[in-house]
Amino acid sequence: MSDVLKSSQERSRKRRLLLAQTLGLSSVDDLKKALGNAEDINSSRQLNSGGQREEEDGGASSSKKTPNEIIYRDSSTFLKGTQSSNPHNDYCQHFVDTGQRPQNFIRDVGLADRFEEYPKLRELIKLKDKLIQDTASAPMYLKADLKSLDVKTLGAKFDVILIEPPLEEYARAAPSVATVGGAPRVFWNWDDILNLDVGEIAAHRSFVFLWCGSSEGLDMGRNCLKKWGFRRCEDICWIRTNINKPGHSKQLEPKAVFQRTKEHCLMGIKGTVRRSTDGDFIHANVDIDLIISEEEEFGSFEKPIEIFHIIEHFCLGRRRLHLFGRDSSIRPGWLTVGPELTNSNFNSELYQTYFAEAPATGCTSRIELLRPKSPPPNSKVLRGRGRGFPRGRGRPR
């Protein structure tokens, strides 16, 4: 029994020594003062010996501060990488103190430095970007009201459709910014979006990416995918940082308690596409389903450009359509359609000629070697009841 007690006391001594080193104390004896245990013990003893006397003197002593009392003015003491009185991180408290969102401290989120420690992935991204640039068609754009436009007149079936509707949710978050180019901005409800004839312009195997906000759009977006003939297969989440302009209230909806700092882009699939066998059409697992980038100015509805990189890296189809695009989103390899465009250059016949010979970007041998692939299927092995013998009434001796 004495050995067990000695072992327990030794472990306790080591824990106190380690805690003292963590808190930067010179000796273990200072732990009581640093953690406040000494004051608690003294007050407990005083309470037991003379409760009435302490109660009488309580009013006079309550206004006096303890000489060694630590007063925290902010949460910098509790952040990662500092000498801390509490080894835990508290980025939520730091947001209350400074307005810096917790996601501001996630490292290596940019496209340039994301794969610095992964040379093969870095080479893969570089090669794919070069191939996409070389095979991209000339950018085309069409200024049109999508409520009255018959999308069948585009005369093409698309491999990828990116939809970026001006949701009423955005108007609730920023009611003061309801104009574009001096004209009132038209916001769409989900019934209008549901009536878009997206299924008619989607190829037999294709993908749709629908920005749906962060509230009721998650459910309504799934209804849209279902009506258009797509199956939801992924949810890309955009986490907005505020490193450049920290603050507490940027886009707060009426009667809202919390500020929304993320937005969702639902991904749908049409037809049968398997990543293990359809390497000529998709390259899976090249990017992640998370975008972390700085939010735009107040009232801006711009989405991160990284969504284009994710789509182009994933789907090798070259027929790409962007609905509700703007002048800032015109991009080689894409047909951009939207009411906020200032000009048009779309020609249906010319657009068709771009894909007559090569509807996909193709793939080089080096990209095929570097890209992540699905594991090979398990080989079928006959399994018996014991020692690997096949099933049967008997076995040869």
From Swiss-Prot:
Residues 37-67, 368-397 are annotated as: Disordered. Coiled coil: none annotated. The keyword RNA-binding applies. Residues 40-51 have a biased composition (Polar residues). Its main location: nucleus. InterPro entries: METTL14-like (IPR045123), MT-A70-like (IPR007757), SAM-dependent_MTases_sf (IPR029063). GO terms for biological process: cell differentiation; female sex determination; mRNA modification; mRNA processing; regulation of alternative mRNA splicing, via spliceosome; RNA methylation; RNA splicing; sex differentiation. GO terms for cellular component: cytoplasm; nucleus; RNA N6-methyladenosine methyltransferase complex. Disruption phenotype: Flies have a reduced lifespan and exhibit multiple behavioral defects: flight and locomotion are severely affected and they spend more time grooming. They also display a mild held-out wing appearance resulting from failure to fold their wings together over the dorsal surface of the thorax and abdomen. Keywords: Differentiation, mRNA processing, mRNA splicing, Nucleus, RNA-binding, Sexual differentiation. It comes from the Eukaryota. It holds the Pfam family MT-A70. GO terms for molecular function: mRNA binding. Residues 382-397 have a biased composition (Basic residues). It is found in: Nucleus. Belongs to the MT-A70-like family. Component of the WMM complex, a N6-methyltransferase complex composed of a catalytic subcomplex, named MAC, and of an associated subcomplex, named MACOM. The MAC subcomplex is composed of Ime4/Mettl3 and Mettl14. The MACOM subcomplex is composed of fl(2)d, Flacc/Xio, Hakai, vir, and, in some cases of nito. Non-catalytic component of the WMM complex, a complex that mediates N6-methyladenosine (m6A) methylation of mRNAs, a modification that plays a role in the efficiency of mRNA splicing and is required for sex determination. In the heterodimer formed with Ime4/Mettl3, Mettl14 constitutes the RNA-binding scaffold that recognizes the substrate rather than the catalytic core. This is N(6)-adenosine-methyltransferase non-catalytic subunit METTL14. It comes from Drosophila melanogaster. The lineage of its organism: Eukaryota, Metazoa, Ecdysozoa, Arthropoda, Hexapoda.
